Amino acid sequence: MVWAWQQWLSPRPQKRTKNTSQVAFYTSENAALYEPLSKPDGNWYVRETHFRENPNVRAGLTGPPLHLHLQQDEYFKVEQGVLGAVKDGVEVAITKNDPVLHIPRGTRHRFWPHPSSTEDLVFTAWADPCKDHDHILDLNFLRNLAGYLADCDSEGLQPSPFQLILFFHEASSILCPPFLNWMPLWLLIWVHNGLAWIAREFLG
């Protein structure tokens, strides 16, 4: 049972979309398509397609907020269009002619469809390590996050910061919103863990 004060502090959709059985799944308003794929060695990667006809894609709003991963390196390879990215405060625009973008663990970063692109953005992304570890960025995290955001959007709700922090915490990742991004990493981790504990223990 969800109490009124929990709903007030952390609004949640009344209906949750089940996307675990879907081979591929869409984000809010079908702005982007996630296609989980497998490598010959059994590791996974994701092909993301961000559709330029969607106004949120043209505005560069379909990427994640600034964040970092504590246990994994992350990699991006563009197949079509232009990917914008920030890596430790340095902004770049990447095309298929550029090498793989490597984001070492602990690096603050974000990515989005770059406004200079004139076509759909298509890129692949993967993390290392990507299996045999608990509490890492994996396909369950991507499905849960995409489904939650889409459900919030369909019901006209603002996503709960506490829920987002808990999602990232369970994937050994840290959100870096502006009011926290000034912190050194050790303090940011401490605050993030505290907020995730509140979300898990008190907000249901």
Curated annotation (Swiss-Prot):
List the induction conditions: Expression is co-regulated with the other genes from the iso-A82775C biosynthesis cluster and probably controlled by the cluster-specific transcription factors iacI and iacK.
What are the alphabetically sorted keywords of the record? Oxidoreductase
Any one GO MF term held by the record is: oxidoreductase activity
Which domain of life does the protein's organism represent?
Eukaryota
UniProt xrefs under InterPro entries? RmlC-like_jellyroll, RmlC_Cupin_sf
- Applications (biotechnology): Iso-A82775C is a precursor for the biosynthesis of the anticancer natural products chloropestolides A to E via a Diesls-Alder reaction with maldoxin. In the absence of the prenyltransferase iacE, siccayne accumulates instead of iso-A82775C and can also be condensed with maldoxin to produce chloropestolides H to K, which show also antibacterial and anticancer properties.
The pathway this protein participates in, as annotated, is: Secondary metabolite biosynthesis
- Quick check: keyword Oxidoreductase in the entry? yes
Keyword Transcription in the entry? The reply is no
Q: Does the entry annotate any disulfide bonds, and if so which pairs? A: none
Q: What happens when the gene is disrupted?
A: Abolishes the production of iso-A82775C, but accumulates pestalodiol E.
E.C. numbers: 1.-.-.-
Q: What is the top EC class of this enzyme, as a single word?
A: oxidoreductase
Family indicated by similarity: Belongs to the oxidoreductase OpS7 family.
Query: What this chain does, per the record?
Result: Oxidoreductase; part of the gene cluster that mediates the biosynthesis of iso-A82775C, a enylepoxycyclohexane and biosynthetic precursor of the chloropestolide anticancer natural products. Within the cluster, the prenyltransferase iacE prenylates siccayne to generate pestalodiol E, using dimethylallyl diphosphate (DMAPP) as cosubstrate. The probable oxidoreductase iacF is then involved in the epoxidation of pestalodiol F to pestalodiol F, which is further converted to pestalofone A by the short-chain dehydrogenase/reductase iacG.
Could you identify this protein by its name? Oxidoreductase iacF
